[in-house]
């Protein structure tokens, strides 16, 4: 399994213990970009939420960097994996800088207080995508 960074084996996903999709087998190598394509209601988000432990697996296994996902703590997983789903997060009173800073939360303590180093990393990330000038703007006021 070591050739895959993320791999599923006979994965079954669904709700309340009932499999809606089963026999899901795939592997993703480090650096690959993968998209799930299908009609509305086909289970794309359910698969993603199951892989990221937002939903309980109905069956099968997920391996992350050759380790079963069930053996990885939520804190460790959140520092190694990020997922963008279609649901909008509630961003009232948040600036663009605040949104970028949420990517640092897995590295903070329980209160989520950013250190000077965290702030430096957030600033570097915004500079990398030329977004410094919108850092203090209301996130809801910028265009998608």
Where are these regions (language model features)?
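Conserved ABC transporter NBD signature motif
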Residues: 60-68, 77
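Helix-to-loop junction immediately C-terminal to a conserved catalytic motif
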Residues: 52
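Conserved ABC ATPase "signature" region
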Residues: 101, 116-135
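Conserved ABC ATPase signature
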Residues: 112-114, 138-144
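The feature captures the beta-strand-to-loop junction immediately N-terminal to the Walker
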Residues: 37-39
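Conserved structural motif at the start of ABC-family nucleotide-binding domains
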Residues: 6, 21-23, 135
């Amino acid at each position: 399994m070591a050739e895959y960074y993320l791999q599923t084996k006979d994965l079954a996903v669904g709700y309340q213990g009932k499999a809606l999709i089963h026999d899901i087998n795939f592997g993703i190598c480090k650096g690959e970009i993968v998209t799930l394509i299908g009609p509305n209601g086909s289970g794309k988000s359910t698969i993603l939420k199951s892989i990221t432990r937002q939903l309980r697996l109905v069956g099968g296994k997920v391996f992350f960097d050759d380790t079963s996902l069930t053996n990885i703590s939520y804190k460790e997983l959140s520092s190694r994996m990020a997922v963008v789903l279609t649901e909008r997060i509630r961003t009232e009173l948040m600036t663009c800088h605040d949104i970028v800073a949420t990517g640092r939360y897995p590295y903070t303590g329980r209160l989520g207080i950013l250190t000077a180093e965290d702030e430096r990393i957030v600033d570097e990330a915004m500079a990398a995508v030329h977004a410094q000038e919108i850092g203090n703007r209301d996130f809801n006021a910028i265009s998608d």
